[in-house]
Amino acid sequence: MIPPKPGKTKQAPRRSKTALASISEVSRMPVARWLQLQQSVHDLLIAEEADGFVANLDAIHAEIDLQMRHHADATLTTLIYLGATEINLYSATHSVLVGAVCALVAGQTLAWSASDCDAVAKAALSMNIEMTALQDHLARQSLRPSAEQQRLIDLHCVLGADLLAEFGVKDKLWLDAVRHHHDKTPGPLAAREPFSRLARLIERVDVYAARMAPREGRSPLPPEMAMSSCRLDENGQIDEAGQAVIDTLGKYPPGSAVRLSNGESGIVVSRSVSAEAPKVVALIGADGKALPSPTLRDTGLKQFRVLQSTAHGSLGGAANLEKILRLI
């Protein structure tokens, strides 16, 4: 994980999980495993039986959490890239991304307790349990939601929390965060009830992830532009939770597609102390043709500085995510 940003990032409390392996013993999860994990999340959220729900969700959370601890930038690269390009299993892809980012922001920047970090991640993973199938359908629907679809959207927070309780979730903080994750309530985090702090962070990351995601009939925003949508609150003021997301992920989050000053385009793969200078794997040359092989660029150097975000579609078929991740 990158060093804390001076003046912005607080030191998160360390967890006493002695069972965790050392950094050298924890391998980066292959992209294929992430796709399997998203399928597991999908299957869990559409299941009609409560048997094993909490244990299975805990296991999924633990696997994601371990990757975020030891391979944060690779995990962000994978999840943000998939979130910006993958329409299959839309709801599960979205929930995994939101949960991972919420936990990282909560621990690294907001310095929340370990229990709050776990609760916000699990709440985000399970927040759409009452509309997983509907959300997948809407991602491929070019028309606006029907009256019945909108009714289900409006009710899914409350019904989802109730269903989670039926499925064995006992953590009131988790349940209340799900129940209120669509609340539009601006204001500082310190003035909120604990559940409201979690719900606000989920809501901000939810907005970010949704706006960069592909949908039928709507072009996704580049991650940098999607990020700016969570920075201001409903009154047009700087939102504390939204700003924490930006402080954590940087101006150009891992997984973003960017254009460099030398004309190349590629994928951001690592944050740095400077929000303006992430590590980038160049994929497309200035001539618009794929480079012979993915090439790591240090955008802190003038000749490789980031000019702007660009659409992932501009990379064509040049982005082999597994090859890109091997360069981190």
Which residues does each PLM region occupy?
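An active-site-proximal "capping" alpha-helix that borders the catalytic cofactor pocket
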Residues: 97-106, 152-165, 222-235
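Acidic/His-rich, divalent-metal-binding segments that scaffold phosphate/diphosphate chemistry
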Residues: 17-154, 168
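Regulatory and interdomain segments flanking nucleotide-handling catalytic cores
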Residues: 3, 131-132, 136, 218, ...
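Low-complexity, glycine/alanine/valine/leucine- and proline-rich hydrophobic stretches
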Residues: 264-308
